[in-house]
Every structure is written in C-alpha cells, then in structure tokens.
UniProtKB/Swiss-Prot annotation:
Gene: smpB
One Gene Ontology CC term in the entry: cytosol
Coiled coil residues, start to end: none
Function comment: Required for rescue of stalled ribosomes mediated by trans-translation. Binds to transfer-messenger RNA (tmRNA), required for stable association of tmRNA with ribosomes. tmRNA and SmpB together mimic tRNA shape, replacing the anticodon stem-loop with SmpB. tmRNA is encoded by the ssrA gene; the 2 termini fold to resemble tRNA(Ala) and it encodes a 'tag peptide', a short internal open reading frame. During trans-translation Ala-aminoacylated tmRNA acts like a tRNA, entering the A-site of stalled ribosomes, displacing the stalled mRNA.
Stated family: Belongs to the SmpB family.
Listed name of the protein: SsrA-binding protein
Principal localisation: cytoplasm
Assigned keywords, A-Z: Cytoplasm, RNA-binding
Length: 164
C-alpha cells in the first residue's frame, strides 16, 4: 500500500526571521510566545508582509510587550486597518515571565525576537534572551565561517578528484 503524500501545511510556516539578531547577539536561551494581534494584522502576515528588524521585547507590570514590530497595513482593509508599528502583547506563562524578568535584570541582556511563524493556525514568536556581541566577536564568527566554507570546498574537490 502506498504512503500518503505529505501536504504542505499553510498553518505551520515561517513568516519572518531576524537574521540580524543572530549576528549582533549571543543567544543564550529561547522561548515560544503567542502574539496578540488584530484581524487585519493576521491577514497582512499571511501575505508575508512583516519586518522583525529593530524590534525588541520589554517587560512592564509583569507583562511582556513587543516593540517596533512592523506589520504593514492590509491592502484590502478599510477604516478598520491597524497602525503598522503598534506595541503588541506577548503571551507567556507567569513562571516564564518571572524567570525572564530575573534574567534580564541580572546583567546586560535583552529580549530579541528571532522568528515569527504560524503553528496550528496561531501566530507564534521565538523570543531569545540575548547578550550583545563585541566587534571582535563578530569578526571571529566571520573568520570561522569562511574557514569552514573553505574546508568543505576542499573536501568536495578531493572527493570529486578521487571518484573521477
């Protein structure tokens, strides 16, 4: 009996990633948080229009808020459209919020959004506890990546030379 083909699930897809955050910060730990959104924001997200650049999370009165997440207005929306850069509430369990509060207060750490995605039809945000990198750390990462790339390239050449 043949196996069923897997369908591409529109309810589980990545909407945006914050590549700059992984470049500028050491990611210490990650959490999954729900995002409170309006109807036109969801529709705009499903069109793939979102920018995580320069966004961050803050903790106020025991609640986590996402700042500077840019979701453009929905093209088919009318007067009910949302403001593109409004502050959005993140949904986490109380014990997770309390542990995050302690970790952010301890040192020079911040909460950075890493990825925005759909999970079972709900918008989720991968939130990272991050510590800023120095310039020399960034240079070391670039050097390490180029060395790894050269090694894999050389291995590929040698394997092709042996098999050819």
């Amino acid at each position: 009996m043949a196996k069923k083909k897997k369908k591409v699930d529109e309810n589980n897809s990545v909407l945006a990633t914050n590549r700059k955050a992984r470049h500028d910060y050491h990611i210490i730990d990650t959490w999954e948080a729900g995002v409170v959104l309006l109807g036109t924001e969801i529709k705009s997200l499903r069109e793939g229009k979102v920018s995580l650049v320069d966004s961050f999370a803050t903790i106020d009165n025991g609640e986590i808020w996402l700042q500077h997440l840019h979701i453009p207005q929905y093209s088919m929306g009318s007067w009910t459209n949302h403001t593109p850069k409004r502050t959005r509430k993140l949904l986490l369990h109380r014990n997770e919020i309390d542990s995050l509060m302690g970790k952010v207060r301890d040192g020079n750490r911040t909460l950075v959004p890493l990825k925005l995605y759909l999970k079972n039809g709900r918008v989720k945000l991968e939130l990272g506890l991050a510590q800023g990198k120095q310039d020399y750390d960034k240079r070391q990462d670039i050097k390490r990546r180029t060395e790894e790339r050269e090694v894999t390239r050389e291995l590929g050449r040698r394997i092709k030379g042996i098999n050819a």
